[in-house]
A protein has these predicted regions:
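Structured core elements
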Residues: 38, 45, 58-62, 72, ...
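Conserved nucleotide-binding/hydrolysis micro-motifs of P-loop NTPases
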Residues: 66, 95-98, 106-107, 147-150, ...
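Core recognition of P-loop NTPase motor domains used across DNA-transaction enzymes
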Residues: 1-55, 111, 125-127, 131-140, ...
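Flexible beta-alpha connector loops of hexameric P-loop NTPases
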Residues: 35, 113-123, 142-148, 182-195, ...
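P-loop NTPase nucleotide-binding module
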Residues: 52-95, 152-164, 171-174, 185, ...
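Cytosolic-facing regulatory segments adjacent to core modules
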Residues: 48, 82-169, 183
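Phosphate-binding/switch region of NTP-binding enzymes
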Residues: 47, 193-261
Length: 261
């Protein structure tokens, strides 16, 4: 027996799709174009290349440990929340909420993170911290530090936030980091599990119509001189799965020469 599916699964004629495409093109070309383009990250050169974070896109941010991918992702999240007033959900599988808050506050206040962790603050640092706290107080940033969280659990938490009629829906999701996620089911191997996770992250991005920034580790192969003489990462260096670049709409690599100096 063949049952009729949801409207979203029906075949769409090209004529209808062209009308929608032309309508969207008029929007992004008109005087209110900024409302219809991707969400600005606050980093001008990056926004020029990406035209912002596209709704429904899965963006992979990859680097070796210690390269600064968490700090960079938190910087984007903070700018999106504060400058664009777009609610951001941060799922940290590596750090606690307290550690995330420390990083966000120290970055916004311009205080050295080491001094922040040890409490070795100067008198003026407390003033900067007070100003940063005031600026961040109403920033729509939501954090979750559940270890081994699944995509199903993430969606449930996002929908719970979105049910509140007094505030706008979550508009950006940041996940730190991909290799610490689980499917909640038994998998034959880790490569298959990561493949399932990235595929379902892309589906979640489309379902919720939000960009997802998922941080990813790189394999140790990038450290080997024979891989490429400058240690600059490439797609083949993504750890645990070849499907990451297939499911992602964009892959960003962080690299600093000084890291290898």
């Amino acid at each position: 027996e063949i049952r009729s599916g949801r409207d979203s699964s029906a075949l769409t004629p090209l004529s209808s799709s062209m009308v929608e495409t032309l309508t969207n093109l008029q929007k992004i070309s008109g005087p209110d174009a900024d409302k219809y383009k991707g969400i600005p990250t606050g980093f001008r050169l990056l926004d020029t290349v990406l035209t912002g974070l596209g709704r429904g896109d899965l963006i992979i941010l990859a680097a070796r440990p210690g390269m600064g991918k968490t700090s960079f992702a938190l910087n984007i999240a903070t700018r999106v929340a504060m400058q664009q007033k777009v609610p951001v959900a941060i799922f940290s599988l590596e750090m606690t909420k307290e550690q995330l808050t420390n990083r966000i506050l120290s970055a916004e206040a311009g205080i050295d993170s080491q001094a922040f962790r040890t409490g070795a603050l100067r008198a003026e640092d407390w003033e900067y911290l007070a100003l940063a706290t005031e600026k961040l107080h109403d920033a729509p940033i939501y954090m979750d530090d559940t270890s081994g969280i699944t995509i199903t659990e993430m969606k449930a938490k996002i929908r719970r936030v979105n049910q509140d009629p007094t505030r706008p829906n979550v508009g950006l999701i940041v996940i730190d980091y991909l290799q610490l996620m689980t499917t909640g089911q038994r998998s034959e191997n880790r490569v298959q599990e990561i493949s399932s996770i990235t595929r379902n992250l892309k589906i979640m991005a489309k379902e919720l119509n939000v960009p997802i920034i998922a941080l990813s580790q790189l394999s140790r192969a990038v450290e080997k001189q024979g891989n490429n003489s400058s240690h600059r990462p490439q797609l083949s260096d993504l750890r645990d799965s070849g499907s990451i670049e297939q499911d992602a709409d964009c892959v960003l690599f962080l690299y600093r020469d000084s890291y290898y100096a």
